[in-house]
From Swiss-Prot:
Temperature-related behavior of activity: Optimum temperature is 72-76 degrees Celsius for RNase P reconstituted with this protein as well as protein subunits Rnp1-4.
Record-given protein name: Large ribosomal subunit protein eL8
The organism's taxonomic lineage, starting at the top: Archaea, Methanobacteriati, Methanobacteriota, Thermococci, Thermococcales
PANTHER family, A to Z: RIBOSOMAL PROTEIN L7AE FAMILY MEMBER (PTHR23105)
Organism: Pyrococcus horikoshii (strain ATCC 700860 / DSM 12428 / JCM 9974 / NBRC 100139 / OT-3)
GO molecular function, one term: ribonuclease P activity
Cell compartment(s), UniProt: Cytoplasm
Length: 123
């Protein structure tokens, strides 16, 4: 299956797994925003340290605005394969199209590592 139009770069599986791990750690020791509306607000306000976007969002328009918005605000973003997995990592029982890490807590080093690798992928 072809990647949706909003997916601008390929994310290695292990990096996507690290992103989900960072969401779980930040959920427990820091602060996250769940869902596209909350994520969009966090990006617009410049609060997000890392944005995680699911690749299987339908319709695409729900999250299509996030990559250009993150680029404009210079906030790193990454894709994960499943909105269900992203929701679970965020601690909710439903799927999440996107999540923003506001305060990484104990995931600070992991978030910085992911952000650095994402910048390399985007080149």
């Amino acid at each position: 299956m072809a990647k949706p139009s909003y997916v601008k770069f390929e994310v290695p599986k292990e990096l996507a797994e690290k992103a989900l791990q960072a969401v779980e750690i930040a959920r427990d020791t820091g602060k996250i925003r769940k869902g596209t509306n909350e994520t969009t607000k966090a990006v617009e306000r410049g609060q997000a340290k890392l944005v995680i976007i699911a690749e299987d969002v339908d319709p695409e328009e729900i999250v299509a605005h996030l990559p250009p918005l993150c680029e404009e605000k210079e906030i790193p973003y990454i894709y994960v394969p499943s909105k269900k997995e992203l929701g679970a990592a965020a601690g909710i029982e439903v799927a999440a199209a996107s999540v923003a890490i506001i305060e990484p807590g104990k995931a600070r080093d992991l978030v910085e590592e992911i952000a650095m690798k994402v910048r390399e992928l985007m080149k």
